Amino acid sequence: MSSLSAPPGGCGGDVAAAPATATSTATATATATATATATGSMEPAMVPRTANLLACKQWWRVCFLYGDQQKYYRQLYSKAAAQRLAGANQENDNAARGAGAGEGEGQEYDTVAMGDGDFIAAQLDAGEDVDDGIDLGDSSQPGGGATPTATATAGRPLFPLSSSPRRSKKLLRSLRAHVKGESRPEKPAKAAKPQSEPSSELTKRNARVTVLDDPFLFGIDADHLGDLVRGKQYSPLEATENIAKFYELQLETTEATAQVLEIIEQEEEPPEPPKPALPPKQKQPRPVPPLPARITQPAVLQPLTAGDLQFLNLSLRHRSLPRSMKPFKDPHDISFTFNELDTSTSATAAAAAAAVAAADVATGVGVGSSQQESNEPISRTPLTQISYLQKIPTLPRHFSPSGCPQGLPPPPALAGCGSALGLPSSSSASALYAAQNGGMLPTSPLPLQRHQQYLPPHHQQLPPLGAGPGQGQGHGLALGPGGAGLPQYSPAVSGCSSTAKYSNAQLPPHHHQLSPALSTPSPPSLLHHPAAGTSASAHAPFLAGPHMDMQRQSHSDDDSGCALEEYTWVPPGLRPDQVRLYFSQIPDDKVPYVNSPGEQYRVRQLLHQLPPHDNEVRYCHSLTDEERKELRLFSTQRKRDALGRGNVRQLMSARPCDGCDELISTGDIAVFATRLGPNASWHPACFTCCICRELLVDLIYFHRDGRMYCGRHHAETLKPRCSACDEIILADECTEAEGRAWHMNHFACHECDKQLGGQRYIMREGKPYCLHCFDAMFAEYCDYCGEAIGVDQGQMSHDGQHWHATDECFSCNTCRCSLLGRAFLPRRGAIYCSIACSKGEPPTPSDSSGTGMYTTPTPPTQRVRPQTRITSSHASSSPPMSPQQQQQHQASFNQAMYQLQTQQLEAAGGPVSQSQSYATSDSDAGVVKDLEHCRSGDHAGGGDFTDFSGGRASSTSHNMSPLNSPGDFQPHLMPKPMELQRDGVYNFNEMSSNLDTAWPAKPPLGATHSYQLQRQLMENQHTSSMPELAGKGPMLQHQMAAHFGQQPALHSSAQQFQHEYADIMHPPPPPPERGAVGEVPELPTPNLSVASTALPPELMGSPTHSAGDRSLNTPLSAHSATHGPTHPVSILSGASSSSPMSGEPAKKKGVRFEGIPDTLPRSRSYSGNGAGTSGGGDKDRDRDRERDRDRDRDKGGDKDRESGRHGPGHSSRRRRRRKSTSSTSSGNHHRSGSGHRSHSTTRADTYAPAQPLSSSYQGPPSVLQADSETAHKSPRQQREREREESAEESDVCSTCSSSSSSSEDYMMMYQLPQRRHYGGVRVSYVPNDALAYDRKRKPAEMAGDKDKNCIIS
């Protein structure tokens, strides 16, 4: 269009030439960019459209062929490009001169082709010298006022590599200026007239050039190109008019330079044709006469040369070349369609293989040929028609580039604003033009995406546009003022261009010039850049609003650019509005918008669904001659017999979808596949491969037996595909394994390539591995010995941990007894055979010997290994330490504990020190640390541990270890438990005696009241279960009360500790009430830890804990005292261990060792813990009921155990184990029942059988609840929960219970299913965890008691 000529001010022409020539025009553009830019900008806009159309076709071909796209394009266009470049160089030179002169050369800008070779070079040079966006501004300058703006714009290189769009625009403008040099508008008013003339002349020339495949490379459809071409047709005249108008506007805003006037004058002649050109946007190349000239030249679609391709590569981001700007097809006629004939030609030129596939696809092939023909595909309503003015109302929907006017699906194009944003629409010329217009994108038709790349997110363009003027250049820039516009169009440069064009509409004259040449109009847009520079703000606002709307509402039938430029591919033969309707029925993430995930998806699917090696021998490896022939035959036959391409049409009448059987409504878009029948139709989203259910890329399908396949899966229905090389297996022999096939020599280790034929291998993720590589890459390491577990070795796995399936590795961490085929208790990263072992009290050291054992604490070293497994209470929450670390840790812990215990024994009355020693008695150094924390906490009056800032936090964290948890109540008791643990077995009677002895010493610690409450509870419980302790209970309670009295928080922590310890089965730290016990050095800490749970304090634990709470709160104490007996009794029963300690078997709940019932009830009671504390009675009862049910399940075992527990005859060892288990379970239950009391209860319950727990839990819960309620329930509950959590970790047995952080979790964990999940069921000697889980689950359901109880005795 004469828009280039319009900016002939030397610059205009030069600019146009500059892109192509890369000569002084670029420099001139830099210098006189303002003037030339306007023109140049206008011209390039046209080219991109045509180019885009061609590019779309070529793109399709390339994609279909699966060949190297660039290579394919080079093949297709190298020759044409060379010719075009030669012609373009000449024309560009002329155009540049004409542009500089401001003469009619502008009219010849249409011979964008001239710029192809030189044009590209010029674009590059121009980009280097001056930003094209700026140049565009210059082009506007010739219009008049544009010069200042252009100059400002020129400040930044229009086509720098970073902002290639501008350079592209320059090139287009220069080319157009060449072609249209004559038609360049002398004046804005005159320009309107000349536009038509220059448009027609130059449009023809440029149309040929536009046919160049930049747009095609961009993936722009032929339709878009056609629209561009049409735009060119119109652009000379209309461009001139538009330019003239634009210039007028700019002149109004800025001075009109002599060059501008000259340009306008030159364009004045063509302006008459331009008017028709604008209408052609409607589908008529009104500047047809000029366009024909242009078309004639464009008709020669020369393949791009390597140089062209290089330039294109650079230009891909600078799509400003006016390729195929021929107005062959009316913009309306030009719809993104691929002509099969064209296809074949193009396909052949591009890549034979690709062409074949394209040909089969038919439509795809058409794309390439269309480009070659370029007349039709490229032809498009000139951008001038599209002139942004349309947005403005000036341009008719012809404004193909924008396509918005036509109400095309260009709304994305409206993203034209986006183009201002610098959003490129790689497939649509309008996008290119928009970018060019915006001065953002290069003129080259390369995908706007790439332009964007150069101009980061379209914004590079925008930044210049950001400046009012810059925006003005490409009304995408103009959008700058209407910022909204840019963002909206950011999706597609085409939209941007449309927007820019529409912005130009503001400058109707100028814009029209630029606009008419989508080839040229875009340049007008560029011109508008400069002009807009002056009036950018005006344009931008206009552009932002109306333009955006125009693009969105593009009404031009032929202007697929507006609607289509935002897509990298569109179904052939559709109008923009139909294209939008089509894509509206496809998932957004699969719509191939430019630079979107949908575009990436399409590219991936092209390669996946149409594998190049299925069609072309050159893509295959190691084929024999026979196989090569067979592949050719195979490919040819497939294409002949099965290949087809869907035809998209708008239904005139409703019909059912062959995919989903639902009705496709009248007026909806449907896809037809003629190979499957003339009436076979699908929803766009239902047109998928029957195997992979993915959308058939570019509607290319293969049919067989009435079903549609993608290329890949159709080939696999005929021949096997090698899983290694992904090629079709044409050989007579192949290896098949696990439903897959391999070439004989391809079935090898995925890692070392060792042939696996006839050898053992392991499949992982569909890839075979030799045993050696598999072990090296995927073998798990044994948690015990640290050695890799080979594929030939048995492996036990649980919760991310792995062991050799040997007696040595998969064994109890404490007593080292084999756990193969047995239930085990996972805790703190280690596995145990029982709760006692998990607490560091080896059950093996005769429980009956408990007294002696606990009396003489085992040396730390003795307990080191078990404790090693059981990390400190902290360890319970933390991953298990390595055995050595654990041993070391435990050794230090034991030593510390031993010392603490000794100190405690010496200073039995010293609650704090005792508490400390007890804390250490937990299990390992971690516990010792916890104890230390407890000590400091206790001394401070806070919890034993830091966690018990209130005497509870640390306890909670340490609760994990039996001692530490109880240590909360101050490790006083903990040292004993430590000793108990060391002894591993102790006489509960002795323990009770010791406790009694110790308790009296402890009274100093506790408040008498709390102690009494505890004592009463203990006495009641103890009386029933542990008379000994009952007697001494008061002292312990006093001590505890004193201790608690010292620190209510401490009481909480103590209670927490007690509960935890009870849970841990390391009663070592009874509750803080036990602090007294802690004082009692007599009770061996280890035993205490075992019996601690059962200790009166522990029993008091429920009571005691309650007592501790009571000591904290007298009401609680009273309440505990009131309910204490019941709960304590339950606890005592539950604290069978305590009972054993007291020597009484009276605990009906005594030692319920049933893992399942106890565990489940425990978990329930534990979960109900907090609740129990607050409403414990009901919750406890419910939990008790659940326990009862569980018990009923496990009744046999439980009752037996319970009777044993109840029976005084139980050996302390048995009792202790049971107590440990049951105490843990019952303790957990109680804890779940009530927060604080649950701690003491936890211990007592731990010893008590599940049923007793239920009873005790129910009974005590009320008491405990009352206590906890009386005393701050929430704090207690929280503390108890914390303790319980730690205790859970310590106490929980995979079979008996799970160690979860909350009482509810405990309950849940204790439930059969949960325990199974936790590993509560014994891990069977099965390589598959799932099998083991199932086995565990069945026994749990059947006789969960046995399985879940980690049967210890």
Curated annotation (Swiss-Prot):
Q: Which GO terms describe its molecular function?
A: zinc ion binding
Residue limits of the LIM zinc-binding domain? Answer: 655-719, 720-780, 781-843
Instruction: Write out the biased-composition intervals (Low complexity).
Output: 147-165, 514-532, 861-892, 1130-1142
> What coarse category fits the chief subcellular location reported for this protein?
membrane
What InterPro entries does the annotation carry? LIM1_prickle, LIM2_prickle, LIM3_prickle, PET_domain, PET_prickle, Pk/Esn/Tes, Znf_LIM
**What are the start and end residues of every segment in region (Disordered)?**
130-206, 266-292, 500-540, 840-892, 933-962, 1062-1303
Pfam families (UniProt xref): LIM, PET
Q: Which SUPFAM superfamilies match?
A: Glucocorticoid receptor-like (DNA-binding domain)
Q: How does it sit in the membrane?
A: Peripheral membrane protein
> Bias regions of kind Basic and acidic residues — which residues?
179-189, 1177-1205, 1269-1284
Gene3D superfamilies assigned to the protein according to its UniProt record, in alphabetical order: Cysteine Rich Protein (2.10.110.10)
Compositionally biased region (Basic residues): 166-178, 1207-1220, 1228-1240
Family statement: Belongs to the prickle / espinas / testin family.
Please give the PANTHER family that the UniProt record associates with this protein: LIM DOMAIN-CONTAINING PROTEIN, PROTEIN ESPINAS-RELATED
Q: How does it assemble?
A: Interacts with dsh; PET and LIM domains interact with dsh DEP domain, in wing cells. Interacts with Vang in photoreceptor cells.
Protein name in UniProt: Protein prickle
Biological classification of the source: Eukaryota, Metazoa, Ecdysozoa, Arthropoda, Hexapoda
